Amino acid sequence: MAKKKGLFTVLKRIFISEVNSEKKEKRRKWTFWKLRIKKRLPSITAPPEHRTSHESHEEQKEEIVSDVGEISQVSCSRQLDSIEESKGSTSPETADLVVQYQMFLNRQEEVLAATRIQTAFRGHLARKALRALKGIVKLQAYIRGRAVRRQAMTTLKCLQSVVNIQSQVCGKRTQIPGGVHRDYEESNIFNDNILKVDTNGQKRWDDSLLTKEEKEAVVMSKKEASLRRERIKEYAVTHRKSAESYQKRSNTKWKYWLDEWVDTQLTKSKELEDLDFSSKTKPKDETLNEKQLKTPRNSSPRRLVNNHRRQVSIGEDEQSPAAVTITTPTYMVATESAKAKSRSLSSPRIRPRSFDTQSESYSPYKNKLCLTTSMMSEAPSKVRIANNGSNTRPSAYQQRSPGLRGFNIGPLKSCNNNNTLLNDLSINSERSLPSWNKQSSLR
């Protein structure tokens, strides 16, 4: 079986090799003829027409590809001829060389194909990038142009508005708005025409027409009258504006004065109410003290509290400003001479009134008499009166000064040497208390 296969193969090679050799000869002749025709064609063809860059680029590309294909075909045909020649030699060395050469040719063909593909693709990418760049540049130019136009329009509008405002301000300053002169001239022309028509129709009392001079005089008088009217109107308008402005100013001043006056009246009314309240509390305290002094001497002490006195301290007076009732027996009531002596030696006493009404803002005698607060703070709750400089005894009730009825003064501590204490005390540093006490005793 192996021998039969060898015979068939030998026969096939014989017949196929002859056929292939004939075809290859014909093919070679055809390729050489093609090359000769292409070499002769440039001399025969006419000059090319004007074409675009893209078309010319594509044509050049096609020509290069066709030339490369023809060259590769020629090289392949030569290689095939050499291979067929080498097949006749049956040496293995030549066969190895032929195989290596074929592999080398195949690699070259692959490299050429790869380079063609790469060049074509790179050219395509470059053209695409160039188109994109051109589009971007155009778009940027368009957008920038629009932005510049828009900015220019806005600036022009702003400038126009600023110019209009400036013209209005200048017109208001000069009080000559634009177009007043024009209106004034037009009104004057219209008035002149009316006056001429009126004068043409006027006649004298005897139905005789007026002369030219008389007509001109009438027109002039009417013009003067119209000018006077306009001046009077302008004067009235300007004075009205000035009067309105003055009235506004006066109204604002009047409102301010009214507000101040109302505030002062409110404060005064509050002060008066406080004074009325304090004056109402006075007579109640005085009536209570008078009743205690006017009680009959023969009245039994059993009805009264047995020798009990309520001694109120300064802290209790401050906490409860109400009047304090003091009950004393009849046999302890002092006579008139004792009262006079005690008045001469006693000091002003705090009346049972609220301390709030005796503040600087509410006191009615703040401009007349001023007593120091140190007297109020240093004064004790008990007042001791010296009887002939021997025995000291607390007073049954606190004496009241007749001259200082409007003041609440704290009780004072009287020492054995009364002259030293009383000589030092004074009211507003005008008169000493001893002289004042003497005058009160004489009264």
From Swiss-Prot:
It holds the Pfam family DUF4005. It comes from the Eukaryota. It is found in: Nucleus; Cytoplasm, Cytoskeleton. Keywords: Calmodulin-binding, Cytoplasm, Cytoskeleton, Nucleus, Repeat. A motif (Nuclear localization signal 1) lies at residues 11-18. Residues 44-65, 277-361 are annotated as: Disordered. Residues 113-138, 139-161 form the IQ domain. Belongs to the IQD family. May be involved in cooperative interactions with calmodulins or calmodulin-like proteins. Recruits calmodulin proteins to microtubules, thus being a potential scaffold in cellular signaling and trafficking. Regulates cell shape and elongation in aerial organs (i.e. epidermis pavement cells) probably by regulating cortical microtubules (MT) arrays orientation. May associate with nucleic acids and regulate gene expression at the transcriptional or post-transcriptional level. This is Protein IQ-DOMAIN 11.
